[in-house]
Curated annotation (Swiss-Prot):
Residues 347-563 are annotated as: B. The lineage of its organism: Bacteria, Pseudomonadati, Pseudomonadota, Betaproteobacteria, Burkholderiales. Pfam families: HATPase_c_3 (PF13589), HSP90 (PF00183). This is Chaperone protein HtpG. CDD domains: HATPase_Hsp90-like. InterPro entries: HATPase_C_sf (IPR036890), Heat_shock_protein_90_CS (IPR019805), HSP90_C (IPR037196), Hsp90_fam (IPR001404), Hsp90_N (IPR020575), Ribosomal_Su5_D2-typ_SF (IPR020568). One of its GO terms (cellular component) is cytoplasm. Residues 1-346 are annotated as: A.
Length: 635
């Protein structure tokens, strides 16, 4: 942040570069849904009151005799302003600079790099990022914030002001009571918002569920003036009770959607939600949502989580990661406990038996929601899987109690249709298994293309046996925990000695035995030439079109996992592969007849070729090219 002007009374500061970019994009991308500014500002006001209520548990003096928390919305036609006021926690000078001048979130730069210039696509991305206070500038060409932090004196208030063009000023101010007033100086074409009926309509649509009263001046018809006139009496324009405390039958889908947008600051509707009251040993209410799009910081393990914790309707914290396991970190919503103490700390949350019960119950509830979506709303589940599938896979290792349920929700690409889209479940695979087949086969690779073109698949394609194509970074980790499904082992086609005996007839088995004996001299010759690079050379039945491939032992780390470990700077053991040769390939016949002078080059070329086909890097590319050119010239 750059400082441009300073004096004892006022400072003019430059917005963080990302804020400038966000303001510009928002004004141009979100204008078609400009009314969200009021939802965002009312939501911020509600959060400020929630935070005061929480801090006042330990510091009752912060309430200063004014314990009735509320939000007020007013407008002034003559001044062309809309004011949103609250008597919540307020802002100190440093908090105003930090919260109204910067975006203190990791991954911000990466987020902006995804923007395309397409208004519709950018609007969705900005919605995932969260617009908050800055949405004011969609309808205002100047915003003034007058705020006094609870516990500070009247003369320690601040006045923040900006036209959204790149700078803001901040100065000391006087304010009689704690809290914040946000004054929007409307743009010239926004007169329709200077209307009590219009503002009430927006508030009831977007903010009816806010648990605090939202008040406006009562208006009566003035026959002389021919218009509505504001009086001194205030009226509450929303229902002012927490949405999650109402009966499900009393809540419309539209109200559920708008509540989601408030708690998540998302621009889009959610994919699904679950609202449930749990009674028994632990009593709590949960209203949990699955978003339609992944947030930009989904893979940031330190990012704030999306579930707000309340205790007896009193807000406690808004990133309580203990309430759901990490693999469900995309879930948004609220959990309201009747059992936890109001002064609960993060340390208590980690040790509380009630919190463990909430965590387990909430995880099961979300999994039930996903199961219902997978079974009854295939299109929605496909959207969910595209956005969050890799995160859900983490659950196979993190949540042993629900591992089987999670396994049933997993989707993969497969040789069945050859498409990159991950649409095949384990149940789909099992339903198509060949008679006599008792294993689920898979291959892992760095990319889908590498997996789909792996030489290890050749015999499976020939026999019509389906293989799952795994190329997500999390897949290898998942497989270390997920060893079977419905009693059927998960088997890598690139590990160990391939055993398809149950699918081979007697004649085929006899031929395999004869071939192994016939090629024994070549195998021994290759083993001697490649003794430093490979553990073993053997004849294989797994190849059809390729001359050779490399495999590792059944209990060894796969080459794909070893590459990932090295790329992450982790120590990775040196694993010598097994070289398998295809006795029916013309190149193997050529090598079989090679002279002793050429044999070493042929053997090295065969191994390097197999390593490249598997996706590995060869140790000496220059030597590979030299050998290849030399053998081509002799051909």
């Amino acid at each position: 942040m750059s400082q441009t002007t300073t004096n004892s009374a006022s400072e003019t500061l430059g917005f963080q570069a990302e804020v400038k970019q966000l303001l510009h994009l928002m004004i141009h991308s979100l204008y078609s849904n400009k009314e969200i500014f009021l939802r965002e500002l009312v939501s911020n006001a509600s959060d400020a009151c929630d935070k005061l209520r929480f801090e006042a548990i330990d510091q009752p003096g912060l309430l200063d005799g004014d314990g009735e928390l509320a939000i007020r919305v007013d407008y002034d036609k003559a001044a062309r302003t809309i004011t949103i006021s609250d008597n919540g926690i307020g802002l100190s000078r440093d908090e105003a600079v930090a919260n109204l001048g910067t975006i203190a979130r990791s991954g911000t730069r990466e987020f902006f790099s995804q923007l395309t210039g397409d208004k519709q696509k950018d609007a969705q991305l900005i919605g995932q990022f969260g617009v908050g206070f800055y949405s004011s500038f969609i309808v205002a060409d100047k915003v003034t914030v007058l705020s006094r932090r609870a516990g500070l004196a009247a003369n320690e208030a601040i006045r923040w002001e900006s036209d959204g063009q790149g700078e803001f000023s901040i100065a000391p101010a006087e304010k009689a009571g704690r809290g914040t007033d946000v004054v929007l100086h409307l743009r010239a074409d926004e007169d329709e918002l200077l209307n009590g009926w219009k503002l009430r309509e927006i508030l009831r649509r977007y903010s009816d569920h806010i648990s605090l009263p939202i008040r406006m001046a009562k208006e009566d018809w003035d026959a002389e003036k021919g218009e509505q006139v504001k009086g001194d009496e205030l009226e509450t324009v929303n229902q002012a009770n927490a949405l999650w405390t109402r009966n499900k039958s009393d809540i419309t889908d539209e109200q559920y959607r708008e509540f989601y947008k408030t708690v998540s600051h998302d621009y889009d509707d959610p994919l699904a939600w679950t609202h449930n009251r749990v009674e028994g040993r632990s009593e709590y209410t949960q209203l949990l949502y699955v978003p339609r799009h992944a947030p930009f910081d989904l893979w940031d393990r330190d990012a704030r989580r999306g579930v707000k914790l309340y205790v007896k309707r009193v807000f406690i914290m808004d990133d309580a990661e203990q309430l759901l396991p990490s693999y469900l970190r995309f879930v948004r919503g609220v959990i309201d406990s009747a059992d936890l103490p109001l002064n609960v700390s993060r340390e208590i949350l980690q040790e509380s038996r009630d919190v463990r019960a909430i965590r387990e119950g909430s995880a099961k509830r979300v999994l039930s929601l996903l199961e219902d979506m997978a079974e009854n709303k295939a299109e929605d589940y496909a959207t969910f899987w595209t956005e969050f599938g890799q995160v859900l896979k983490e659950g196979t290792g993190e949540d042993a109690a629900n591992r089987e349920r999670i396994a049933r929700l997993l989707c993969f690409a497969s040789t069945h249709d050859g498409e990159q889209a991950q649409t095949v479940s384990f149940a789909d695979y099992v339903g198509r298994m060949k008679d006599g087949q008792d294993k689920i086969y898979y291959v892992t690779a760095d990319t889908f293309t590498a997996a789909a073109n792996s030489p290890h698949l050749e015999i499976f394609r020939k026999k019509g046996i389906e293989v799952l194509l795994l190329s997500d970074r999390v897949d290898e980790w998942m497989l270390s925990y997920l060893r079977e499904f419905d009693g059927k082992s998960l088997v890598s086609v690139a590990k160990g000695g391939l055993d398809l005996a149950e699918l081979a007839d007697e004649e085929e088995k006899k031929r395999q035995s004869e071939v192994a004996e016939t090629f024994k001299p070549l195998v021994e010759r290759l083993q001697q030439a490649l003794a430093e690079q490979v553990k073993e050379v053997r004849v294989t039945q797994r190849l059809v079109d390729s001359p050779a491939c490399v495999v590792v032992g059944q209990n060894e780390l796969s080459p794909h996992l070893l590459r990932m470990l090295k790329a992450a700077g982790q120590e990775a053991p040196e694993v010598k592969p097994v070289l398998e040769i295809n006795p029916d390939h013309a190149l193997i016949a050529r090598i079989r007849d090679a002279s002793d002078a050429e044999f070493g080059d042929w053997a090295a070329l065969l191994l390097d070729q197999a390593l490249l086909a598997e996706g590995a890097q060869i140790a000496d590319p220059a030597a590979f090219v030299k050998r290849l050119n030399g053998l081509l010239l002799k051909a």
